[in-house]
Curated annotation (Swiss-Prot):
It comes from the Bacteria. One of its GO terms (biological process) is protein refolding. This is Chaperonin GroEL. Coiled coil: none annotated. The keyword Nucleotide-binding applies. Belongs to the chaperonin (HSP60) family. GO terms for molecular function: ATP binding; ATP-dependent protein folding chaperone; isomerase activity; unfolded protein binding. Residues 527-547 are annotated as: Disordered. The keyword Iron-sulfur does not apply. GO terms for cellular component: cytoplasm. It is found in: Cytoplasm. Residues 534-547 have a biased composition (Gly residues). Together with its co-chaperonin GroES, plays an essential role in assisting protein folding. The GroEL-GroES system forms a nano-cage that allows encapsulation of the non-native substrate proteins and provides a physical environment optimized to promote and accelerate protein folding.
């Protein structure tokens, strides 16, 4: 076991504080509309340029073990904030650094760390209650666009694109961000249910130019097992032929005699048909087939529930307005499923999402939810260079997370003003002793730092601006760093999601409070390099030799 180095009390806290300050100084420059970029060296490829706080924080590794411990703990705040709200990582870092800095001073002055932490917790609870009380629900697409614009550093096109995507796929829909190969940033919306399985045979194609199979108003057979025998399939095929409608078969697989017969019928024009493999694997495949059956008002044909293929009637088949199948994906548009049944299925998936502990399962269930609820939107981020695309993608990701958070918990005035206004909530707090009161004061000072930093980054004097804002009693009155003007921030469209502001303070206070109560740090001692081997001397007795 390697030897350890142990530091105590103020020495320990001071060493950690140095590391925290280094990380905080690198992250805080990115805050606000006039925040600066940070360039990060990569082990291969071009350097990365970003304004994303958590990306900067994750890259910082310090040579001094004790300083690095402090930096890692604050990095944890940024990561936790990113997981909880997906935005506000810089704000969380700044708040945590302020709480630790002021708390360390108080402990050095002889105050009780545990009482300080209790005071911090009481103050944070009061601020959170104030934020929730003043939160305003997002009601319009314009407000969604404003939140996205602020998070994307004033890029209006990004805010509007996210607002359009949410409008089209709904709040439950999936919106993903990808890198584009072109210069333009585009929005691609897939309405209806799409899954990543294409046609089983190119002979099913109806549009040779586009290489797709399009079937209008088809019947849909949803089968759990493989289909290889023709005999069991014949009664359904005959019933569909008599109806004059097309047929789409979604099954684990269609092969052999069954596939050959379907292809022959399609080529002869006797039956418009297409066969597709079922999406997913194992239990997830069964769940997705049930989703398709509910969406199309059909029945999942499964021997488990006593339905044999030869007994299937037209009433058991699903219906949809149109189905579009290409080589790699199938899209069901306007399924005939009853709204009540689809909503019940959505509620069931939501409760499963709440119960699961696996991130992978949660992600897959959210995909299923989106497909049932509305659709999928893809924002393809373009740019002139790879570096520019990556930087813009970071901002679009942040903006997307911020808009989701805004829809979830509402919005507050931006620019750090909501936290500033919460100072009033700390005025009447009752605490047990003077040390706890100092804990409340630590939070009072910390919640002013984001607004100060935004002003500092835009070239103004943070202390002067914050003083002006506190003097004005209007809740939404604030400073627009982009235009260097004062006014009603909500009317100016400068708003922050309540969830982002709330979790930033809670995460910062959680780690900051623990750091204040630290009394010892244990870290590995740096390894001493062993001395190098001495150089070999010349061999003796070799003189007088000619070469």
């Amino acid at each position: 076991m390697a030897a350890k180095d142990v530091r105590f009390s103020s020495d320990a806290r001071d060493r950690m504080l140095r590391g925290i300050d280094i990380l905080n100084n690198a992250v805080k420059v990115t805050l606000g509309p006039k925040g600066r970029n940070v360039v990060i060296e990569k082990s291969f490829g071009a350097p990365r340029i970003t304004k994303d706080g958590v990306t900067v924080a994750k890259e910082i590794e310090l040579s001094d073990k004790f300083e690095n411990l402090g930096a890692q703990l604050i990095r944890e705040v940024a990561s936790k904030q990113n997981d909880a709200a997906g935005d506000g990582t810089t704000t969380a870092t700044i708040l945590a650094a302020s709480i630790v800095r002021e708390g360390t001073k108080a402990v050095a002055a002889g105050l009780n760390p545990m009482d300080l932490k209790r005071g911090i917790d009481i103050a944070v609870a009061a601020v959170v209650a104030d934020l929730k009380a003043n939160s305003k629900k997002v009601t319009s697409n314009e407000e969604i666009a404003q939140v996205g614009t602020i998070s994307a550093n004033g890029d209006k096109s990004v805010g509007e694109m996210i607002s359009t995507a949410m409008q089209k796929v709904g709040n439950e829909g999936v919106i993903t961000v990808e890198e584009a190969k072109s210069l333009e940033t585009e929005l691609d919306v897939v309405e209806g249910m799409q899954f990543d399985r294409g046609y089983l045979s190119p002979y099913f194609i109806t549009n040779a130019e586009k290489m797709i199979a399009e079937l209008e108003d088809p019947f849909i057979l949803v089968h759990e097992k493989k289909l290889s025998s023709l005999q069991a399939l014949l009664p359904v095929l005959e019933a569909v032929v008599q109806s004059g409608k097309p047929l789409v078969i979604i099954a684990e697989d269609v092969e052999g005699e069954a596939l050959a017969t379907l292809v022959v019928n399609k080529l002869r024009g006797g039956l418009k048909v297409a066969a597709v493999k079922a999406p997913g694997f194992g239990d997830r495949r069964k769940a997705m087939l049930e989703d398709i059956a509910i969406l199309t008002s059909g029945t999942l044909i499964s021997e488990e529930i006593g339905i044999k293929l030869e007994n299937v009637t037209l009433q058991m088949l699903g219906r949809a307005k149109r189905i579009r199948i290409d080589k790699e994906s199938t899209t069901i548009i306007d399924g005939a499923g009853a709204k009540g049944e689809i909503e019940a299925r959505i509620a069931q998936i939501k409760s499963q999402i709440a119960e699961t502990t696996s991130d992978y399962d949660r992600e897959k269930m959210q995909e299923r939810l989106a497909k049932l609820a509305g659709g999928v939107a893809v924002i393809r981020v373009g740019g002139a260079s790879e570096v520019e695309v990556k930087e813009k993608k970071d901002r679009v990701d942040d903006a997307l997370n911020a808009t989701r958070a805004a829809v979830e918990e509402g919005v507050l005035p931006g620019g750090g003003v909501a936290l500033l206004r919460a100072i009033k909530a700390l005025e009447g707090l009752t605490v047990e002793n003077a040390d706890q009161k100092t804990g409340v004061d630590i939070v009072r000072k910390a919640i002013q730092t984001p607004a100060r930093q935004i002003v500092d980054n835009s070239g103004g004097d943070g202390a002067v601006v914050v003083g002006k804002l506190i003097e004005n009693p209007s809740y939404a009155y604030g400073y627009n760093a982009q235009t260097d003007e004062y006014g009603d921030l909500v009317k100016l469209g400068i708003i922050d999601p309540t969830k982002v502001v709330r979790t930033a303070l809670q995460d910062a206070a959680s780690v900051g409070g623990l750091l204040i109560t630290t009394e010892a740090i244990i870290a590995e001692q740096p390894k001493k390099d062993s001395p190098a081997m001495p150089g070999g001397g010349g061999m003796g007795g070799m003189g007088g030799m000619d070469f």
